[in-house]
A protein has these predicted regions:
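Conserved helicase motor core of P-loop NTPases
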Residues: 8-36, 113, 146-156, 161-310, ...
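Conserved P-loop NTPase motor core of helicases/translocases
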Residues: 8-19, 29-31, 52-147, 186-187, ...
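A short helix->loop->beta-strand "cap" motif at the edges of active sites that frequently abuts
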Residues: 132-133, 154-158, 373-375
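Structural recognition of the conserved hydrophobic beta-strand(s) that form the central parallel beta-sheet
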Residues: 53, 136, 157-163, 379
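Dynamic helix-loop-helix/coil hinge segments at AAA+ ATPase domain boundaries and subdomain interfaces
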Residues: 1-9
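Hydrophobic positions on the alpha1 helix immediately C-terminal to the Walker A/P-loop
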Residues: 39, 43
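Conserved Walker B
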Residues: 137-143, 164-165, 343, 356-358
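C-terminal accessory regions
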Residues: 301-383
Length: 383
């Protein structure tokens, strides 16, 4: 392996930190194409200790596996485990169900049972971190204060990778604050030939991105061929009104009808509920048609890693109404279109990006959206 002087210095600093262990984590920052992942892989292969790679979402973990990483997990799966259920409450509802004669009440009881039976979470006693010599954590900006503290509680040294060119995390302040311990700024010569890295570099530097073809990626005008959107794994947008319109249109293209989710639909979580394993920005699939109750929806869900859960969710997002920020119900919406802010920490093979954000952090917004694509990108602009 041939290293640039900057990469060689980064490797030296990582090894020095690991040997001295004067602090529990080391942050390695770098723009897209500067070799963060290459350095991390080399460290994992040559340190001679068991190493676990971790990503914030299942989609990002999948991309790491595609790149040849063998031992990879999501953060939540690695450190949290389902814990005991509300047994007494479940037994009381089951007893009521046996004698209940009113169909509406039976439906309510069944969804209360689903909700109580869903897993709640605690730190894993059998976490893979327990026997681990090193954790390599991708996208460290997405780690909240609580998750960061939980990670450190296992006592395993953490090499945290991140990209300061991206948007700040959507939830506020990350656990990993301040400048990275080492920052890579030199985009590798071979990476410059990658169309997505090239487009990302133009965006980060605030340069114009002309219309045209970039390998298998492209920049097109809005209002043309809609196949680019239909073929994408994920549509990313800048505005909530575009997200609403995109979700409506894509549901219609697929063949779903009605306001509320049918079986097999794609949802995104809009509010953290760590106690039961729901995290803001996490995507889920519906296993059954939603059940409409008096003041909420009953949802049967499965996440990217096959974990099943029941939810009692507020109806407002599915009806285009303002969210109730203070409700005890969980909050989901359709996930066919996501804002770039909500997409942070994840990645898809094929992305369609509606370039429409001209608010704060314009260059970071575009850079973040572009780097959500692993293989193929279509940027759709208004003019």
């Amino acid at each position: 392996m041939s290293w640039t002087p900057q990469q060689s210095a980064a490797l030296l600093n990582v090894r020095k930190w690991f040997s001295q262990k004067d602090k529990p984590f080391f942050t390695l920052g770098g723009w897209a194409g500067t070799g963060k992942s290459t350095i991390a892989n080399h460290i994992a292969e040559t340190l001679g200790v068991p190493t676990l790679f971790m990503a914030y979402t299942g989609k990002a973990a999948y991309v790491l596996k595609r790149k040849g990483v063998q031992d990879v997990s999501t953060v939540h799966k690695a450190i949290y485990t389902p814990k005991g259920k509300a047994t007494l409450a479940i037994q009381a509802l089951q007893a009521e169900l046996l004698v209940c004669k009113e169909d509406k009440r039976k439906k309510e009881i069944n969804h209360q049972l689903d909700n109580l039976s869903r897993p709640s979470f605690a730190l894993r006693n059998d976490s893979p971190l327990s026997g681990c010599g090193l954790v390599i954590l991708d996208e460290y900006s997405m780690i909240s204060q609580q998750i960061g503290e939980d990670l450190l509680s296992f006592g395993c040294p953490i090499l945290a990778l991140g990209d300061p060119g991206q948007l700040p995390p959507p939830f506020g302040t990350s656990f990993f604050t301040g400048p990275p311990d080492v920052m890579l700024t030199d985009v590798r010569r071979q990476a410059k030939d990658n169309p997505i890295i090239h487009l990302a570099t133009l965006a980060r530097e605030g340069k114009n991105i002309p219309l045209g073809e970039y390998g298998e990626s492209r920049v097109v005008r809005r209002g043309g061929n809609s196949d680019f959107v239909k073929e994408a794994d994920q549509l990313l947008v800048g505005l909530n009104k575009s997200r609403d319109a995109g979700n409506r249109n894509l549901r219609r293209m697929i063949g779903f009808e009605g306001d509320f989710p049918n079986a097999g639909e794609k949802l995104v979580c809009l509010k953290n509920n760590a106690e039961v394993g729901f995290f803001n920005g996490q995507t889920w699939k519906t296993l059954e048609n939603a059940t409409v109750l008096d003041d909420c929806l009953g949802l049967s869900l499965e996440d990217e890693e096959g974990l099943k859960a029941g939810a009692l969710a507020q109806t407002a997002p599915f009806l285009g109404q303002p969210l109730d920020r203070f409700t005890d119900f969980d909050t989901f919406d359709y996930g066919y279109a996501l804002t770039v802010h909500k997409s942070q920490g994840s990645q898809w093979d094929k992305v369609a990006l509606l370039d429409e954000w001209y608010g704060n952090h314009r260059d970071q917004w575009l850079y973040t959206g572009i780097t959500r694509a692993a293989e193929k990108l279509t940027i759709i602009r208004n003019a």
